[in-house]
Design a protein with these regions (language model features):
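Viral structural modules
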Residues: 1-192
Length: 192
């Protein structure tokens, strides 16, 4: 079997060819994802409970629903810069100093850093009637702290991104009959 050698071609560069340039881009040392959940007990005041029961007494407003509104989550941002708290309803911050640790990775021990991160959010919980009209609202804040082992050498910029904040009411969201509940549990999940 014989092979034919390819003909050598001279390809000229276009007149507008780009020259090679160096650009500065961030180097990613580590990336972690997790789901962090916290439960909060939400209590209605006597006045709020009275408004809920008045709405439930009106058949044209039943059923009532409990809904929760989570804040807009910002895009990836640096924790090392002072302007990282641009969103008033959401915070991500490093608590304390990072600590050097040695951890096993693939059978070898490597140096890493242990970092405690605190995630905090403001959530608005509303009771609405069948038409979506607000009966009462309750503001609630929730925080969760988690330790992460990272490759975080000196001079590295720590970035934070929460892809979503989810709130749910495990006991259900529909209110049909009196008496109105005086409290319920709200479960908040931070997707980091």
């Amino acid at each position: 079997m014989s092979y034919t050698k390819h003909k050598t071609r001279n390809i000229s560069k276009a007149a507008n060819s780009l020259q090679e340039e160096c650009i500065r881009v961030p180097k990613v040392y580590d990336w972690v994802t997790d789901q962090l959940s916290v439960k909060k007990k939400i209590e209605f005041t006597h006045e709020q409970k009275k408004k809920i029961e008045e709405a439930m007494d009106d058949p044209s407003r039943r059923p009532l629903r409990i809904v929760c509104e989570t804040p807009y989550v910002p895009p990836l941002f640096s924790l090392n810069k002072p302007d990282h708290d641009q969103c008033e309803d959401f915070y991500c911050e490093q608590v304390g100093e990072k600590r050097d640790v040695t951890v096993p990775v693939n059978g070898e021990f490597v140096d890493a850093q242990l970092v405690d991160l605190l995630f905090t959010t403001e959530i608005k919980v509303k009771v609405v009637d069948r038409h979506g009209c607000e009966v009462v609202d309750v503001n609630c804040n929730a925080s969760v702290m988690e330790s992460f082992v990272l490759c975080y050498p000196h001079g590295t910029e720590l970035m934070c991104e929460i892809s979503k904040i989810v709130c749910r009411i495990p006991s259900g969201t529909v209110l049909l009959n009196c008496p109105a509940p005086s409290c319920f549990t709200l479960e908040i999940t931070f997707c980091v």
